[in-house]
Amino acid sequence: MTYLDPQQFIITRKRKKYRFAKFHNAANCYECDEWCQATPEVRQSATVLEVGAGTGMFSVELAAQHPDEVFVALDVKGDRLQKGAYTALERGITNVLFVRARADQIGELFAAHSLKQLWITFPDPFPKRRSAGRRLTHPTFLRQYEQLLRPGGSLLLKHDDRDFFCWSLEQLVTQEWSIRELSFDLHESSLPDEYKTLTAYEQRWMSEGKAIGCVRATTGNGQ
């Protein structure tokens, strides 16, 4: 792999080239094609996937809480993911990996029925109707998630936008997912504490007084 020297971009260190160089060089980061070429031991180790992970900090915190699981934070923007990647390296958290890829590529990146959990945290709601197909809870994506989850595996969603959250619940029910846990105000609920691990967006919305919706759903006979 070609080494990119972040110091070449030191004058513009707040810009994307500097952050992309850091992502490129991190041992726990993979471009889409690099992940596809990784050893089976690496690719098949993943048990929890976060789609649209942003900085990946949510996955880092969950990985710290669950050292026996292997987490993958996936996002199309490597300049964002590098933040979580370097935080994990600095803290010695080795059970979280970072993949730069689009959400619609996950079927190529992970084996069928290989994941215990799949997290979607504060995705773009794409409020315009003509953009509904881009929502990460659109039926097209839900069918992909179903193929990736193990029997009994869970899909979890957190969001502050009530309209998007309710629309997502409708899609889950329509696609015959079973709602196992649900709250329209996560941080005032009795749901597990790990669900309340904060993302950067979550901290922002809560500071503005917004309630966070959270749902866990399964397919088939999952619990």
At which residue positions do the language-model features occur?
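Conserved beta-strand/loop positions that form the S-adenosyl-L-methionine
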Residues: 51, 74
